[in-house]
Amino acid sequence: MATQFAIETTDGPPCFFGGMGSPKTSFQSGLQWLGRKGTRLGKRIVSFLLRERLKRYDFRLYNQKGQETIYSPYSILGIGMKELELKSGFPEHYLWVGPFGSSIERAENYPLDLSPYAGYKKVFVSCGTQLAWAKDNLLYQTQQLAEAHPDCHFFVTLGFGGQDFQCEELMDNVSVVSYLPYKEYIPQMDYVIHHGGAGIFYQCIIYGKPALILPHDYDQYDYAVRGLEAGIALTAKREDTEAIGRAFDELLARDDWPDLNRLSRAAQIYQPTEILKSEIHRLLGDKEK
């Protein structure tokens, strides 16, 4: 499964509630318990309302173990890293396969020469490919940071993959490009500002790049709080210019990111293909028995 946030667990912060982190008080623990119960109640209500349609499939929302039947009872392979997760109580057959996945676009179709910016701290800025409504604010916030940090050069990608490559110099130290593949360009950057999408979140970990996360919706808040608690990223509200400025200052001021280095090494250990093969052999072996 593409995100561990969708599946219910028996403990830990529920997801899609604005980014709940590890509980620090009994009150926060109580809120998270209510969140988990509320999630389950919401699903039961929807299932009840659709009961006539679901009847033909003999659908049951939960099995005897209290686990969701929409997921396999034999094996669930989850993209992501166990080292980052705040939830606990996953089904016993849930396996982490590590962070993977990259752009399908070819890097040679998006030629951006970075050599003229060798004297700058290079900052990759993105809000992904699906948040068209957020791009104006992203450009505005980037311009504010660029004015305050002339020693940095900001590369804003608009996420228009599949189109002809375009590059516009919005300011002396702001380049706006139509699209840049993460895998090829993030390794060449010093810092990343992003929206908290799964792909860029893990690319920053893989290549050891400190990030400032400005979450916009859905599970992006959950990624942001995990990045913050793991010590690999900072976060701010997407339209709070002052908070973004302070967070970016802190990002630049930090010389050492030991947790980021540790998690970057951990990300390399995962072998998703081997895990998949192992699970296939295990399941076939169980069937033969």
Predicted region positions:
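A donor-sugar binding/catalytic signature common to diverse glycosyltransferases
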Residues: 179-225
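Short beta->alpha connector loops at strand-helix junctions that form conserved
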Residues: 2-4, 196, 213-218, 235-239
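A nucleotide-sugar donor-handling region in carbohydrate enzymes
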Residues: 37-122, 129-130, 160-161
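Conserved nucleotide-sugar donor-interacting segment of glycosyltransferase catalytic cores
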Residues: 1-32, 83
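Short, conserved active-site loop motifs that form the nucleotide-linked donor/cofactor pocket
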Residues: 74, 94, 152, 173-175, ...
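C-terminal amphipathic helix plus adjacent low-complexity
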Residues: 243-289
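Catalytic donor nucleotide-activated moiety binding site of glycosyltransferases and closely related
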Residues: 126, 140-178
